[in-house]
Amino acid sequence: SVDEYEILVRGMLFACDFSLEEAQGAVLSSVVPELTEVFTILLENLIGKPPILVSHECNLGIEINTDTPAKVGQDRLINASAAYQQYKTSLIIIDCGTATTLDVVTADGVFQGGVICPGLLISADVLFTKAAQLFQVNLEMPEYVIGKNTTDSLKSGLIYGYGGMIDSLIKRITNEIEQQGQPTPTAVITGGLAAKLLPILSNVNYHDDLTLRGLYLFYLLNKNNTRGKRL
């Protein structure tokens, strides 16, 4: 409910020593439709005005070239926007979260779509649930790729396997981009699980706060517009 989430949000803000009186506005990016209205009401209760809702129709600082822009995840667009504003070149943006996504932005700032894979944790959970003789392990990088026991073999398959998948996709996407006449893309990675994979990935730039920076940029670009707000 709104009240339950408000207690959690107030607690997080208190832990960060942030006063609501300092808030000039709010941005809401939601990929869970049933919670969008809940958090819209919550934020309006907290700051006295509705948040700006992230939408493909708002100013993102990039253009969108996909079959159905409205279906592209807002988190993917926000990450792409933040990365492009920093690098201003062709990009592959990798987000290691619930899903693992690799998205493409051209050198002239056009979001071209990308790749969506099951996330590392989802894959691990399915493996542990469906394979009767396998058991849950911590997602830590083993010392060697070749595991001498089931625990290390599982860790190797998950960590090195996902790292290899991402590296392979980066190479394939890069080839496709270059064939279209674009410069070799810069790879940018973010997400809660990115740090676990970073040591085995090749030539990627890590930004743990890419999404937050993207939301702030979105606010700056849209704070004077009414589009995207709940009216």
Positions of PLM-derived features:
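Short, surface-exposed recognition loops or helix-turn segments adjacent to catalytic cores
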Residues: 96-99, 142
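Short beta-strand scaffold segments in enzyme catalytic cores
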Residues: 93, 100-105
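Nucleotide/phosphate-binding catalytic cleft detector across ATP-hydrolyzing
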Residues: 1-91, 108-231
